[in-house]
Each structure stands twice: as structure tokens, then as C-alpha cells.
Regions:
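Short, charge-rich amphipathic alpha-helical segments embedded
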Residues: 1-10, 74-90
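Charge-rich, low-complexity linker and terminal segments
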Residues: 65-66, 83
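Alpha-helical adaptor scaffolds
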Residues: 1-51, 58-60
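Register position in tetratricopeptide repeats
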Residues: 19, 57, 87-91
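Short coil/turn linkers that connect adjacent helices within long alpha-helical scaffolds
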Residues: 37-41, 72, 76-79
């Protein structure tokens, strides 16, 4: 399976947990299987965005901040990640 296809499957599965009211399970799935290599492809950015969104949904502000910070450092214009990072409560 191609890496981008595997990433999309992870995103769909993790997002399904969020849709079922279990965003922390989606975050756990992504953290267990997703990697953040030195050479990034678009699917790595999508994985980080999904992790940040699900962490925020789960009330894990620190986890959301970490995922969105990593993403914004790689690509400040990726979707609305910069805005989402700014809107997260401090601490």
C-alpha cells in the first residue's frame, strides 16, 4: 500500500472515532501509527492536522497545540492550522 493511501485510511478511521464521540481514541490511533519524518509529504501534514483537530475535540489542548505547532512550523499556510493554533487557550 502506498504511504499516502495508508495515511488516508488512518485519517478516515481516526475521524470516525471523532464522529462517534470518541476523539481521544482517534488521537491514540494516529499517535500509534503516524510518523513525522524529516522529509514531509502532504499526507504527513494532513495526519498532523487531523491529530490536532481530534485532540482539540477531546479537550486535550496541549496535544492539539503540539500537533498544530508541528504542522505550522512545516507549512504555516496549511488549511486553517495557524488560526486554530492561535485560538487554542494558553497553557
Amino acid at each position: 500500500m502506498q504511504p499516502d493511501t495508508a495515511a488516508e485510511l488512518l485519517i478516515v478511521a481516526a475521524s470516525a472515532y471523532g464522529d462517534l464521540g470518541q476523539p481521544a481514541a482517534g488521537v491514540a490511533l494516529l499517535r500509534r501509527h503516524a510518523r513525522w519524518p524529516s522529509e514531509l509529504a502532504d499526507h504527513h501534514l494532513r495526519l498532523a492536522y487531523t491529530e490536532g483537530a481530534l485532540a482539540e475535540q477531546a479537550g486535550d489542548t496541549a496535544g492539539a497545540r503540539k500537533a498544530f505547532t508541528r504542522l505550522v512550523e512545516a507549512d504555516p499556510s496549511f488549511y486553517d492550522a495557524s488560526d486554530r493554533l492561535r485560538r487554542l487557550p494558553a497553557g
